[in-house]
Amino acid sequence: MPTPLALLLSAILIIGTYFAMPFWPFRKSNYDPRGKHCYITGGSSGLGKALAERLVKQGAHVTIVGRDSKKAEGVVEELKAIAAPGQIIQCIAADLTSPIASTNAIHAACKPHADQAPDYVYLCAGFSRPKLFVETTKQELKDGLDGVYWVSAYTAHEACQMMSKQRRTGKIIFVASFLSYVSFAGYSSYSPAKYALRGLSDALRSEMLLHNIDIHIFLPCGISGPGFDAENRTKPAVTKKIEEGDTPITPDVCAAALESGLKKGYYQITDNLVTEPIRLRSNGGVPTNNFLLDTLWLIVSSVGVPIWRMTADSAVRSFRAKVEKELEAKGYYVS
């Protein structure tokens, strides 16, 4: 086990390296949205909307996709107000949990672009409805996979086929979650799909090297907004206890973190330092972001992550009697 002195020195090196990072040329990145067709699922709210605004300001042609056509059209008007002449800004209304609708949506978006595949695909669609597993219905379990995994997997599949058939390079960016690395009580209908999304992204990062298509994955923590508010309405008390002290960041800050990682050429992109130790403990052998910094984080994670896990498990045990009483009041038990 590392000595206290070693941990202190590691912490100093990590902090110093972190603040020096903006001045270090880690790797070349060809990320430049100017003039590119950027296709954003879940683009009518939250991270997707904030990202769309940033991309329009950088001169990109933007297509947003969402279920609510009226809401999406309203966002398009906002985007057009900040766009320059010649930028193509449009929306597509579609239920992306359907493979047919996903295919039709991306092809419709490409019509104004001579049917060429999008340059950048940002997969921001998804939702979270935390509940205890024993109180979750079978349909809710299925909805969790549909609304988190398949809603992105179908679009990613069609985008990969379009790009490769047309021999076009491009980028596909999955938006996963901190809960793609680690999970705990309350997220049994959500984190399995996020784990699956990370598995798909890892596989495609390797496979798409055959076609010169770049794959990235963004793993943020909580993002403030209507989606986060809806999540909290069903979130069990034990889950809130484990997350106590976590402050969600705004969609604008989150979008900035995503683009910062893309500009640095990172494969796995996070939005705060808290996620870094978890990323290094669970990265599945994918490329690191920076060898030196990641090595230091790995040392810290060898102590920090087990402590966090023990703390989380202790919190769950402390709720055992309370949950049992609540379930009993609902007539859950058979004896």
From Swiss-Prot:
Enzyme category, top tier: oxidoreductase
Mode of membrane association: Single-pass membrane protein
Oligomeric form and interacting partners: Homodimer; a minor portion forms homotetramers.
InterPro entries in the record: KDSR-like, NAD(P)-bd_dom_sf, SDR_fam
E.C. number: 1.1.1.102
Secretion signal span: none
Keywords: Endoplasmic reticulum, Lipid metabolism, Membrane, NADP, Nucleotide-binding, Oxidoreductase, Sphingolipid metabolism, Transmembrane, Transmembrane helix
Principal subcellular localization: endoplasmic reticulum
Family: Belongs to the short-chain dehydrogenases/reductases (SDR) family.
The species this protein was found in: Cryptococcus neoformans var. neoformans serotype D (strain JEC21 / ATCC MYA-565) (Filobasidiella neoformans)
Location in the cell: Endoplasmic reticulum membrane
Protein name: 3-ketodihydrosphingosine reductase TSC10
Region (Involved in homodimer formation): 141-207
The encoding gene: TSC10
Active site per the UniProt annotation: 190 (proton acceptor), 194 (lowers pka of active site tyr)
Motif residue range(s): GXSXG: 42-46
Transmembrane segments annotated in the record for this chain: 288-308
Family annotation (Gene3D superfamilies): NAD(P)-binding Rossmann-like Domain (3.40.50.720)
Function, in words: Catalyzes the reduction of 3'-oxosphinganine (3-ketodihydrosphingosine/KDS) to sphinganine (dihydrosphingosine/DHS), the second step of de novo sphingolipid biosynthesis.
Annotated binding of NADPH, by residue: 42, 44-46, 67-68, 71, 95-96
Reaction(s) the record says it catalyses: sphinganine + NADP(+) = 3-oxosphinganine + NADPH + H(+)
GO cellular component annotations of the record: endoplasmic reticulum membrane
